[in-house]
Regions:
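Active-site acidic/histidine proton-transfer and metal-coordination neighborhood
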Residues: 1, 6, 45, 49-133, ...
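Histidine-acidic metal/acid-base catalytic patches
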Residues: 1-6, 11-13, 122, 127-242
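Glycine-rich, proline-tolerant flexible connector loops at the mouths of alpha/beta enzymes
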Residues: 8-41
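Short histidine/acidic/glycine/proline-rich micro-motifs that form metal-
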Residues: 13-14, 28-30, 59-63, 89-90, ...
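The substrate-binding groove and active-site-proximal loops of carbohydrate-active enzymes
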Residues: 27-33, 57-62, 83, 140, ...
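Alpha-helix-loop-beta-strand connector modules within alpha/beta enzyme cores
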Residues: 28-54, 129, 195-198
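Structural motif corresponding to alpha-helix initiation and N-cap regions
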Residues: 36-40, 67-71, 92-95, 118-119, ...
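A structural motif corresponding to the C-terminal end of an alpha-helix
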Residues: 42-52, 80, 101, 105, ...
Length: 242
């Protein structure tokens, strides 16, 4: 309904739809045995609606997950036809493990950061494998505060554009910590995140990585998620057409 045609698919949703048990202790076994044909069916269903899955984010690539789950993540990404599997920045040992399976299956990995985002946060991941990329949330980068500013964000993108797989777009306030209500997530254009400047930089330099809408601000009364996603899309279009 929002006319979105390129998405990052969240694993928790698709796994539940395939019948993954709710018990965490049963999840590894399910992931080890689920047929990749199920993911090919998901790809087909989205393709029939004109939607491309450019990235898959399964919740099973952390330090406590088994090797078989990391391997599953790579296989599922390929079955979905996605360009990237995305996951959270993790420790060095786990990054090496992920890199091993990424190279084995020839899958690119986009690492996401929250408030630990900085100009050096991705250094180890990028050095560990040529298959490692940056999944940059520009709202989290600004909200982290400290040395992170609008100017450093734009420079970071310029300096690392060849290793960025995608951006998450949201408008957060500078130097605000994460909170349960997400009250510092603003309607686009009302926060401190330079969404406009980032989009224009992408346009100016013809960067080919994806910028995705991540709707996290409180939905205004009388509206809904679909309407707000459309507003965000129109915001982007207005910037790029200006």
């Amino acid at each position: 309904d929002s006319n979105s045609d390129n998405i990052e698919l969240m694993g928790s949703h698709v796994e539940r739809s395939m019948g993954m048990p709710r018990s965490r202790k049963d999840s590894p076994d399910w992931r080890s045995n689920v047929s990749m044909n199920e993911f090919k069916k998901v790809k087909k269903a989205f393709n029939e609606k004109g939607i491309n899955i450019f990235a898959y984010k399964p919740p099973c690539m952390g330090t406590r997950n088994k090797d078989e789950e990391i391997e599953y993540a790579m296989k599922a990404t390929k079955a979905l036809g996605a360009d990237y599997v995305t996951t959270e920045l993790t420790d060095e040992t786990n990054t090496k493990r992920i890199s091993y399976y990424a190279e084995k299956y020839k899958v690119k990995v986009g690492y996401h950061a929250h408030l630990q985002a900085s100009d050096t946060a991705w250094d180890f991941a990028l050095s560990s494998s040529n298959n490692s990329y940056i999944n940059l949330d520009i709202g989290h980068y600004i909200a982290a505060g400290g040395e992170n500013t609008k100017e450093t964000l734009l420079k970071f993108i310029e300096n690392n554009h060849s290793r960025i797989c995608s951006l998450h777009l949201k408008d957060r306030q500078a130097g605000k910590t994460m909170n349960p209500t997400g009250s510092d997530n603003q309607i686009w254009g009302e926060g401190d995140t330079p969404i406009k400047e980032v989009l224009l930089l992408m346009q100016k330099n013809s960067y080919d990585f994806t910028a995705t809408i991540e709707l996290e601000y409180r939905i205004p009364e009388g509206s809904n998620v679909v309407k707000e996603v459309i507003k965000c899309m129109n915001y982007c279009k207005a910037v790029l057409d200006s």
